Regions:
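Conserved alpha/beta cores of soluble small-molecule-handling proteins
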Residues: 1-124
């Protein structure tokens, strides 16, 4: 059996924790392919998450904490997965969030994706 996960802040997420996120929409994400439990360009993904968090929430979580959350999700499943890391406000989109509301992290893994086998051509 292959285990894929949905983790919130480094631990398995419950349906109750995920429900507000499904309807809030106040979030940003990055998606990556994990091969052999490694990610190419992880530093670029972390940079993207950091800058987008500052733009959206006025603050960012430490890279080490986000990296720990990613590592926990990757360790819980197969060595090759597709991974999406979503940074969101637990207060939601339609509420006034104070400066003390810290963004949270949802990490979801799924089956590894493979790109196209041959060259691509753009249609005009």
């Amino acid at each position: 059996m292959t285990d894929f996960v949905a983790h919130r802040n480094g631990r398995p997420a419950t349906a109750e924790e995920l429900a507000p996120l499904a309807f809030a929409g106040y979030a940003h994400f990055t998606a990556m392919q994990v091969r052999g439990r490694r990610v190419r360009g992880l530093d670029l993904h972390l940079e993207r998450l950091r800058y987008a968090s500052i733009e959206l929430f006025g603050r960012a979580l430490p890279d080490d904490r986000v990296r720990d959350y990613l590592r926990a999700a990757v360790a819980a499943g197969p060595a090759d997965v597709s991974l999406t890391a979503t940074i969101y406000s637990p207060a939601g989109e339609f509420t006034v969030a104070g400066a003390d509301v810290e963004p949270e992290v949802l990490v979801r893994t799924g089956p590894a994706a493979s790109g196209p086998t041959g060259p691509l051509a753009l249609a005009t």
